[in-house]
């Protein structure tokens, strides 16, 4: 754990000071806020006050500090006004009055109002203390404190029964927290004296400044840190020189006295002495984390901890030589106690344990220092082995082995006189003392430098390994020390080099994590077979994001921090975005909420940040790099640093789609403001939401949400797939008329049902629609034409549908078999002699005759659908199919002819001869009576509709049908009908008409009459039925004049001996199309 610096943040210790200074006397108090004029609400309530009054803290908080809730009937009104006046004028006030507890019991109270000022000199708080003085007032006072139910006196002194004594914060808890539990009887006496006599100095409600003497050093200050650096160097010097001076001292000097100390030794001793003095004036950190500045507390703390060790280490052994005091060898060993100062370095160096390089350096220094100590001891053992020998020198010591190898052997000589000079052997490891008291002197041996280096080599080889054997232990003492050295070496090797390994791994941890994640990413790409372009994008994005955040997960890192601190960090990280003019009107709380919604984003070159059509979920602020906005390959905008992209603020449930792509040009760093978090923040601060919405429109560099819908409409309108159908739908909606005809698919053929003598109307146009099949009346059984088809066909001009008006065909003659015939479309017949089946529409005037099929092209006026590749390859199959369909059609026609002939015969035999109604043309009289029974109209009752056989009177066909009731005309449909040529005609005249009337809506009797045919007219032949009477009129002239072609009754009716068809007639117009007979169908 790093050393604690202590809690040095400025604090407001007002509450602790109040609890300490006014303990006992002012323990029952409340604090009122003087800034809220008029009310002065209570902001703090002591437990003693709650104990006195019986009110809980929750009941007292935010009430007036005048404590009007304690007033009762005996409370003086004058005192009330004086308290109010003192609070309003921010003055001190003291009074005695009667207050009431929560239980309703009165007590005498000494009330003291004291204003508390802040650092600006303004009154910030009111200290209102309450002291129970009921006992003092009751002594000799009137007897008015008796209870109602008894004669025993009841004093107003509050008891502690029923209350939790641990909650007495003003007297116990706060007093303990302030660190003043020491008994201070004198201080209490002075405070009590000050309450009743002199007033004590009141604390101020402000941040307390650090109170310290100018001669007190802060333990974590710069001056003390510099001094600790000098002490560290001095301690290291002592750790190196003291073992060397003790163990590797020259033995040639006399043992009676030692030489003078060096300058470095004297400087180190002076530093140690000054360090003791400074330690008495240096702050320390208490167990509660507070920094103690009191000199008395500092001295007491230092004396009880490190003082004794520092005094022993600072004994001036070297200074004794300056005062001519001899220091013998035994006393000189006391300098090794200075090595204990190394223990003081551990707490100071612990604060640097977070730096790997510093820890690595310290570990290596410790290992080298231990090796130096082992080398000094090894040299001392070898020296003592030689000096302890008798008359003959030992031959097995490590120094003897070294001397023989270096050819500098040891030898004994007689002791020289005191003033004699050494014979040049002052640099070797010889001893100048007497050998065992024999008067012999040891000389020779290796030099001191060679001996120390060899000893250090042995120490390092023994600590790091088991040694190499070139310097070995020979004597018992040397072997024992070698064993101890190996044990220490094993421990140091594990500790030092284990820590070194951990430190090196920690130094390369980020690099290892990078390679590990890269390897995982490549394995993922290989397993899932990611394509090469996507693989390159993944690797580039990973490398770019790693370069930005160095692999640190900021979300996880900040999650452990409190919300307040995390918001401040987020505001610092996103200050570029929050400094936009868009947020200048936001409060600090709103900015903090918005900063938590911001997320960093990154975009690589060529990467798409947003695709067209994506749902916009955030606003993006470009911090660095450049981007471009694309739409259909066109660059709409280029964005750079400081640009804001996104959309206007949508509603919470609204989804806005992007109208363009946003692509990165370079490596871009962005800040992303999520719309969900933005909505949540604006919901907390609704006053800022309107200004933000208005400002966002002007701050957006490019609005990705503008015109999204119109862009989609434009794109769809350019599509050419459904252009014709879209045009028809528009005309159908707007009610516009035009000659547009929508194409019909091949599987929905339409056949023309109009005869040459009929003209088209809206109903006919609808029947000609390519998506509808012309309805045919079912003649078998009880069937009848569908009512739905009749309703749509006979709607008439009174209620024309808008769709039919838009699809009305232009008037044009059609003198050839129409190409819309089902047989032509299906490929059964060859239209106009053409061998190729085609699907065409006539959009212009055709030629007078269609002897050959016109060539397709723009000038022909035909919309053709050519064969596909598959149809060309299957020509033979289509020919066979066409032939089979033709044969089947012929069989069906023959069967129909037989059924129709049979039906006619049955109806003529079974139907009674009576007058049937006939429609009357406008302006004509009643129908003439029938003169012949065979010429009367024949009515056949089929059970569903009445069918009347009528002569083809021209007035009936050309006239206007009268309608007795307003609205659409009755559902009547005249149909021409001709018998097959194989049967003799049962009719006395050329043609008869079937008139179907609805059972539910019969025609009025006045509008129906019998109109027999003229018996004198001969029956027309087949040729006469086709060409008309002797006065021929060309079909072209009839078409141009709008009148029907001549024939029986003024209308030429089709007559096909091979078939029986029903064609809608009676809807002539002057400008409609004249249809010719289709060969082979009888239409």
Swiss-Prot record:
Organism ancestry: Eukaryota, Metazoa, Chordata, Craniata, Vertebrata
Region annotation (Disordered) ranges: 137-157, 729-810, 832-873, 972-1055
Record's protein name: Voltage-gated inwardly rectifying potassium channel KCNH3
Source organism superkingdom: Eukaryota
CDD domains associated with the record: CAP_ED, PAS
GO biological process assignments: potassium ion transmembrane transport; potassium ion transport; regulation of membrane potential
Family under the similarity heading: Belongs to the potassium channel family. H (Eag) (TC 1.A.1.20) subfamily. Kv12.2/KCNH3 sub-subfamily.
Organism for this UniProt entry: Homo sapiens
Domain (PAS): residue spans on this chain: 18-90
Topological region Cytoplasmic: 1-228, 281-302, 353-361, 501-1083
